Amino acid sequence: MSRAVRLPVPCPVQLGTLRNDSLEAQLHEYVKQGNYVKVKKILKKGIYVDAVNSLGQTALFVAALLGLRKFVDVLVDYGSDPNHRCFDGSTPVHAAAFSGNQWILSKLLDAGGDLRLHDERGQNPKTWALTAGKERSTQIVEFMQRCASHMQAIIQGFSYDLLKKIDSPQRLVYSPSWCGGLVQGNPNGSPNRLLKAGVISAQNIYSFGFGKAMPWFQFYLTGATQMAYLGSLPVIGEKEVIQADDEPTFSFFSGPYMVMTNLVWNGSRVTVKELNLPTHPHCSRLRLADLLIAEQEHSSKLRHPYLLQLMAVCLSQDLEKTRLVYERITIGTLFSVLHERRSQFPVLHMEVIVHLLLQISDALRYLHFQGFIHRSLSSYAVHIISPGEARLTNLEYMLESEDRGVQRDLTRVPLPTQLYNWAAPEVILQKAATVKSDIYSFSMIMQEILTDDIPWKGLDGSVVKKAVVSGNYLEADVRLPKPYYDIVKSGIHVKQKDRTMNLQDIRYILKNDLKDFTGAQRTQPTESPRVQRYGLHPDVNVYLGLTSEHPRETPDMEIIELKEMGSQPHSPRVHSLFTEGTLDPQAPDPCLMARETQNQDAPCPAPFMAEEASSPSTGQPSLCSFEINEIYSGCLILEDDIEEPPGAASSLEADGPNQVDELKSMEEELDKMEREACCFGSEDESSSKAETEYSFDDWDWQNGSLSSLSLPESTREAKSNLNNMSTTEEYLISKCVLDLKIMQTIMHENDDRLRNIEQILDEVEMKQKEQEERMSLWATSREFTNAYKLPLAVGPPSLNYIPPVLQLSGGQKPDTSGNYPTLPRFPRMLPTLCDPGKQNTDEQFQCTQGAKDSLETSRIQNTSSQGRPRESTAQAKATQFNSALFTLSSHRQGPSASPSCHWDSTRMSVEPVSSEIYNAESRNKDDGKVHLKWKMEVKEMAKKAATGQLTVPPWHPQSSLTLESEAENEPDALLQPPIRSPENTDWQRVIEYHRENDEPRGNGKFDKTGNNDCDSDQHGRQPRLGSFTSIRHPSPRQKEQPEHSEAFQASSDTLVAVEKSYSHQSMQSTCSPESSEDITDEFLTPDGEYFYSSTAQENLALETSSPIEEDFEGIQGAFAQPQVSGEEKFQMRKILGKNAEILPRSQFQPVRSTEDEQEETSKESPKELKEKDISLTDIQDLSSISYEPDSSFKEASCKTPKINHAPTSVSTPLSPGSVSSAASQYKDCLESITFQVKTEFASCWNSQEFIQTLSDDFISVRERAKKLDSLLTSSETPPSRLTGLKRLSSFIGAGSPSLVKACDSSPPHATQRRSLPKVEAFSQHHIDELPPPSQELLDDIELLKQQQGSSTVLHENTASDGGGTANDQRHLEEQETDSKKEDSSMLLSKETEDLGEDTERAHSTLDEDLERWLQPPEESVELQDLPKGSERETNIKDQKVGEEKRKREDSITPERRKSEGVLGTSEEDELKSCFWKRLGWSESSRIIVLDQSDLSD
């Protein structure tokens, strides 16, 4: 009677289907329908009860899942397997647990069902039960717990009466009775029928879900339906297996997941196998525990001498962990012996190898007869329990053949990939495995044990599987001897049908081979078919001797036996023999030939020589071990033969008379061979490795001759003398051969090690060379970073010098913009002014070579600022010109030029005095002759410059701009007296601090630069702004901040112009923020006198008040923009607020950043560019370099030949204003400077410590200024002195900051020319505070002064003694001032004419040259566009204001021209003489000083 069966919900699995009309399909369908009658009818027809559907599910699984108890009973009675694995690894026990029916589960457990099994997700039956819901799972889980408790009680040793009372899981089932109570179930009847106590089932096999247990033997049917007895397999607890006290712990792996450990059980030494799971296993890995259960079931049924015997099963207390107790294994797996612990077993005798192979084949044949397929046969599965004794195990993956050819897999766990190296292709591809699959694996083991190589060269299993899938398969190793080669070649065919050789055939071949070896030891070679069979075989491993029957367990015993035989593996004698064998193994010792042909009791080692030597050629050094064994086994056999047969004794008696002679002759030949080998080895030792490749075919077995090497005739004669050797002589020879083989093996190993060491040393040497190259380039690049370690240039280099071009060092990192590939063009564009031997050799930093244009210029400016305002002014202007040229040329590559190059080039003028201080020591070491030569060259160049005859170098398209800079700076590259002030000393430390901070950036920056002027001393490097002129903004890193006087006020407006344009471009620049942090910006020093001229103030009020206000608004807007890399945020409103009414825009000369200049240049047409460059060449512009848009130029008429515009700013001295205005403006300027520096510092670095330092420095500067103020007042300095001192303040050294304030506080009435002697006096006042300069340097300066004394005397006379008396000059200045006040309006035209006459000569000789030098190359790179409207408008206004200023100046300084007419060139010579005395010059150089200008016409 059928009924519809509903599938439990939620069901963990789906039910499969069968779509055919077979009885098996009908069985499944009737089970699903619940038709018990039809199911029983079909079962009576004798169908296969465990037929599976599409998901691998049996009818029992379906019945248990649906909770059909009657179906389960009948299916179990017909032999259905309760532990059958579906494709997902689940069993009918899982299905019964999910159904929640205790009776179904108890029936399955009673039939042998196991509660420990897991599906592929690692879930056991208890987990399935819990997924069925709380209502159904509660009782079934409690039932499982009762079964586990009962099993634990049995294991713990409870009496047998317990099994009598509860002999079946069904007795543990409880169901609700009609009375509401619990009654005990009956396994043989309905649950309601009670069973009498003490009734025991006749089955007598107890299974409670943890394996079958039985109290006595009983019959059972194997898979082949054969009657058999069940063996007793004890179930023990964990505490019964312990570690032995008299032996160390020994464990080894027995496959990928199993580990074997030697322990003791009840006094018996056993080996326990357990699962080696990771510490935190994945859930699916729990299914690996089923492998031990499967092996336990297989091992409990199988008994064979060569199968590892299972002695007991050890269950943990919670029954979750299973361990199998096997017989003791003393050595380990074959895999560990061959590959992991080969050093412990260096010699594997061939006889042992053959015995092991025979044992494995026998065990495998037994499994096949029993209907099992091992499937996982490998060297892991072969366990060597003792020397020469192997056991086959690892049966967990074994398949059992059942009825109708069905194979039963107890685990459904796929074969591990680690075993794919030995597995047959069909096993790897998870196809049906047969006995041919085991033959394939056996062949792999045979090849592995004979070659010491893991199959597939030890590739990973996943790679092997990919190779098999792609159609790649293994072939037999050609190194195998012939019988074994045939076996392997036949056994590893891809297709199973091609594996024609079965295990019985293989066993027969191995047996015969063993017999042949044994018989060959006691018969003549002509009688031995083995020798004849192998002699013609071309393979190198033909002759495999068999060892004795007593292989040693440990290498120590083998070493002892070697010693007993007299072997000395490390002696020179053996080494010499081995060397010869290595050099030409085809030419073995003739005694080996004799031993082969004369006596077969000792195997011939000649083939072994060839076979051993072939090992390196094939790249398989692992052959050495078993090849050594062959020689070694021959020695052992000789020992046995010496003691054994009477035939041997008779041969000794017969050969007695000739034995001693033959032995002596043999020893002599051996000595000869050793000597020859020594000589030959010493000559050709280097080529021994290459000569180890040879072929066994080179040996001529017919005549014994050598095809590759002809031995001496005596050696050939020795062959005939040794034909009648006795066994004693054979023993001695075999001993030598053994030593030879051992040493040959050692030498091969040493050669490999030496080769590896040589490779490593070569790699290390290459790395060291590369590192040294990097370090050399790095050190070269750091030469200018540590500039103080290098001497100053001893003279100007030649004009046509081009620095070398070097490649970038590997250790130097390019900047973030990645523009270094454009740097190789720099050396041609930037000629250096330093000595050729001192230039930078690293291409990465050659972008800063042009910075040396400003190096010498700024150095001379710093010196001139120590008391020569006039010269310093001119030099500052020249520096502006050169700096503009340099910055332009250094950025010719375009707006994306290397930021690090911009960084390095623009900081060249950072270091004012420190570079000279650093190099004082090296300068003192210079040769006096070099100084003299330099002096003469400078003198000659100065003459040319003074007379306007300076030659023009030829035009170079790529270096035209820098050539002008070079020519402009040649007069400046002179030695300077080391006059320093305390502030200069501090500045030296500041530069060192910068250098220390900059070096780790990886850019070898050039910090060896000169100072432009006083402000360069006062201010370090200003971030972001990069032009070279005369004024810098305060650096946050600086330690002192002397006041500027009006110089900073002038620079403030200039700063705005530059900052405004640059801040816009900085947002578009490709430079990284880090690359522009130390870029400096210098500004023109404006006319100080105009600030203090009442007429200038009036002019300012009339003409520029409104534009300045507009500009100030623009300035504030520009400075409100965020700056990259921590640019200074200047509060210009406060800085310029107090002086807005007296600061004309025309007083500021904006020297914009390099990018601005390049952009302007690239944007304009060539014609406009030429006009602009021509305008820049004006001599007037040399005093105030400007590079501005065309709109800023104004047409003007002047006497300079090629100028068509008025300069935008002229820093010529004008008549000073009142004392009060000067003093007040100075104080305002001082406050502005202080505020600016503090604001700038806080915005950039926010370092309270440095801000405090700056404040302290300013306080000290103010105090010093006040002291000098009083000093000036007490010395009755005329008011006219102020103007000159104001001019001085822009260029005076850092050592005289307070002098500026002192000068400001005096009345401004005298001209600049009159103020020089007093300025020198005050400058000397501070110079005296410094420590004395180097005596050697002073001597050099004094020598230069003496050599040019006549010129100096002449200048001193005309200039009233250069130093001049302060009183005379003061008197003249007073007269001049009075004259100016009276005749300012009358002498305007006269002064204009005089000024034109003074400058006419200079213009006439220099204009063309300067114009031509300023012509930029046509290939200048386009730059980014920047807004120029506001700047041009500002410059136009500056020109207007400048014109008015010059008019006022000319009107109030009439006496200046008068004094010039009276004194002639005395004033100018006075300045020059003082300047020359400082520098050691005897004649003037080209220092252009324009005090006034007539360009305003």
From Swiss-Prot:
CDD domains in UniProt: PK_SCY1_like
Record note on modification: Phosphorylated on Thr residues by CDK1 during early phases of mitosis, promoting the interaction with PLK1 and recruitment to kinetochores. Phosphorylated on Ser-437 by PLK1 during late prometaphase promotes the rapid depletion from kinetochores and its subsequent degradation by the APC/C complex.
Intervals of motif D-box: 852-860
Gene3D superfamilies, alphabetized: Ankyrin repeat-containing domain, Transferase(Phosphotransferase) domain 1
Entry GO CC: cytoplasm; extracellular exosome; intercellular bridge; kinetochore; midbody
SMART domains listed in its UniProt record: ANK
Molecular-function annotations in GO: ATP binding; protein kinase activity; protein kinase binding
GO biological process, one term: cellular response to leukemia inhibitory factor
InterPro entries for the chain: Ankyrin_rpt (IPR002110), Ankyrin_rpt-contain_sf (IPR036770), Kinase-like_dom_sf (IPR011009), Prot_kinase_dom (IPR000719), Ser-Thr/Tyr_kinase_cat_dom (IPR001245), Tex14 (IPR039339)
Stretches forming ANK repeats: 27-54, 55-84, 88-117
Motif GPPX3Y per UniProt: ranges: 795-801
Tissue expression summary: Expression restricted to testis.
Residue numbers binding ATP: L233, P234, V235, I236, G237, E238, K239, E240, V241, K273
Record-annotated Protein kinase domain positions: 227-518
Comp. bias (Basic and acidic residues): 989-1020, 1037-1046, 1160-1174, 1368-1406, 1428-1460
Subcellular location: Cytoplasm; Midbody; Chromosome, Centromere, Kinetochore
Result of altering K321E: In a gastric adenocarcinoma sample; somatic mutation
In-chain residues carrying the UniProt-annotated modification Phosphoserine: S175, S437, S567, S665, S1106, S1404, S1459, S1496
SUPFAM superfamilies listed in its UniProt record: Ankyrin repeat, Protein kinase-like (PK-like)
Record remark on domains: The protein kinase domain is predicted to be catalytically inactive. The GPPX3Y motif mediates interaction with CEP55.
Quaternary structure note: Interacts with KIF23 and RBM44. Interacts with CEP55; inhibiting interaction between CEP55 and PDCD6IP/ALIX and TSG101.
Family: Belongs to the protein kinase superfamily.
Role description: Required both for the formation of intercellular bridges during meiosis and for kinetochore-microtubule attachment during mitosis. Intercellular bridges are evolutionarily conserved structures that connect differentiating germ cells and are required for spermatogenesis and male fertility. Acts by promoting the conversion of midbodies into intercellular bridges via its interaction with CEP55: interaction with CEP55 inhibits the interaction between CEP55 and PDCD6IP/ALIX and TSG101, blocking cell abscission and leading to transform midbodies into intercellular bridges.
Full protein name: Inactive serine/threonine-protein kinase TEX14
Species this chain originates from: Homo sapiens (Human)
